[in-house]
Design a protein with these regions (language model features):
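Charge-rich, low-complexity N-terminal segments
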Residues: 1-152
């Protein structure tokens, strides 16, 4: 069985060497969809009986590990030194330094890597993360899917 929980957050970024307007500082209303697989819990009387995982628990993990960390932050590539220096000069600015350019593809992959370790098989029902879908806009998104990600 597969279940999916959607969360939204706002963040700024730029794609430093992009040929178009994405090279400028800008922001998005991102949406993050987390898809998990597992067996439906059959334990009689368990709070999660009939579920793969309680949707509120799926949400809490994604909020703690990704959405709250990235929300109202500027996601900046470590190699984008001009912008990084500028952001570091602003006292108290919420900046998240990324090891890769913060494209939708790289953000989806980063979210997958972080969340994969967080959704552990706590119920004994073979729970695991299958996909992270990150919407940059309502019409543009990237998927990080378990069977397409190398174990690096």
């Amino acid at each position: 069985m597969f279940i999916t929980r959607r969360l939204e957050f706002d963040a700024g970024h730029r794609i430093p060497h992009h040929k178009s307007q994405c090279r400028h500082l800008h922001g998005h209303r991102y949406a993050l969809e987390v898809t998990l697989s597992g067996e439906v819990i059959q334990t009689e009387g368990a709070s999660e009986q009939g579920m793969v995982m309680d949707f509120s628990d799926v949400k809490d993990v994604a909020l703690q590990k990704i959405a709250n960390v990235w929300d109202h932050a500027f996601l900046v590539y470590r190699g984008d030194t001009q912008v990084l220096e500028f952001l570091n000069s602003i006292p108290g600015h919420k900046t998240v330094v990324m090891d890769s350019v913060p494209t939708a593809e790289n953000l989806a992959l980063e979210a997958f890597k972080v969340l994969d370790a967080a959704y552990i098989d706590v119920y004994g029902n073979h729970l695991r993360l299958e996909r992270v879908r990150l919407y940059e806009t309502p019409n543009n998104w990237a998927d990080a899917v378990r069977n397409q990600i190398s174990e690096s």
